[in-house]
A protein has these predicted regions:
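Short, small-residue-biased leader/transition segments that mark boundaries at the very start
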Residues: 1-6
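Nudix hydrolase/Nudix homology domain
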Residues: 12, 71-72, 83, 110-117, ...
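Acidic, metal-coordinating catalytic segment for phosphate/diphosphate chemistry
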Residues: 13-48, 54
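Short loop segments at secondary-structure junctions
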Residues: 23, 53-56, 64, 133-138, ...
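A short local loop/turn or secondary-structure capping micro-motif enriched for an aromatic residue
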Residues: 35-38, 67-70, 151
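A glycine-rich, hydrophobic loop/mini-helix early in the fold
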Residues: 46-78
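The catalytic Nudix box helix
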Residues: 59-60, 76-109
C-alpha cells in the first residue's frame, strides 16, 4: 500500500478552490478542498487533460486501490483548479504532476466544458476538458505512484470497452474527446 508523504498530505489539506456561479463566473469566495458546503447554485472548477499520441492511442491511468472513490478505475489526468489558478494552468499542473509530461506548447488545447450537479451534496463542479497531442512512449511517462497504479496507451475501442465494463471514469461526459 502506497503512502503519501506528510508534505503532500498537508498540501492537499490546505488546498483552496474558487467558488463559481451557475454561469461559471467566479463569486470571489473560496472553499477548502473537499469541504462540501456548496449551495446548489455554486460550483468549483476541475480540469481533465487527455493526451493523444500521433498514432491515435490515448494515455490513460489506473487509479490506486486506496482511493475512496472509484478505486482501480481507468481515467485521464485531471483534478481541481486551485484558488486563483486559470483553467489552462490547472491542466498543465495536473498533467505534469500525474504523468510527468509537459503539455505546454503541445498541439491541441481546450475542447469543451461540462457541468456535474449533485443537488443537496455540496459538490457541484464544472469540468474543462483539454486534449493535447504528444509523440510520447513509455520512457516519457513518470506517473505519480501515490495516485496512479499504472497506465497504458489505449485505443478508442479499448477505452470504450473499459467504459462498458463500468470502470472508466466520466466516459459518458467526455467520450467525444476520444473521437
Amino acid at each position: 500500500q502506497r503512502q503519501m508523504c506528510i508534505r503532500d498530505r498537508y498540501k492537499i489539506m490546505e488546498e483552496r478552490w474558487d467558488i463559481y456561479d451557475k454561469n461559471k463566473q467566479p463569486t470571489g469566495r473560496i472553499m477548502k478542498r473537499n469541504d462540501w458546503t456548496l449551495k446548489d447554485d455554486e460550483y468549483h472548477l476541475t480540469v481533465l487533460g487527455v493526451i493523444r499520441r500521433p498514432d491515435g492511442k490515448f494515455l490513460i491511468t489506473k487509479r490506486v486501490m486506496t482511493k475512496a472513490w472509484a478505486p482501480g478505475w481507468w481515467e485521464v489526468s485531471g483534478g481541481a483548479a486551485q484558488a486563483g489558478e486559470a483553467s489552462y494552468d490547472a491542466v498543465l499542473r495536473e498533467v505534469k504532476e500525474e504523468t510527468g509530461l509537459d503539455v505546454k506548447g503541445a498541439e491541441g488545447g481546450y475542447m469543451f466544458t461540462y457541468k456535474r450537479e449533485n443537488p443537496g451534496e455540496g459538490d457541484n463542479y464544472f469540468v474543462d476538458v483539454y486534449r493535447f497531442t504528444l509523440d510520447i512512449d513509455d520512457s516519457d511517462v513518470n506517473f505519480q505512484e501515490a495516485e496512479i497504479d499504472g497506465y497504458m496507451f489505449a485505443t478508442t475501442d479499448e477505452i470504450k470497452a473499459f467504459a462498458e465494463e463500468g470502470i472508466f471514469l466520466h466516459y459518458d461526459s467526455i467520450k467525444k474527446v476520444f473521437e
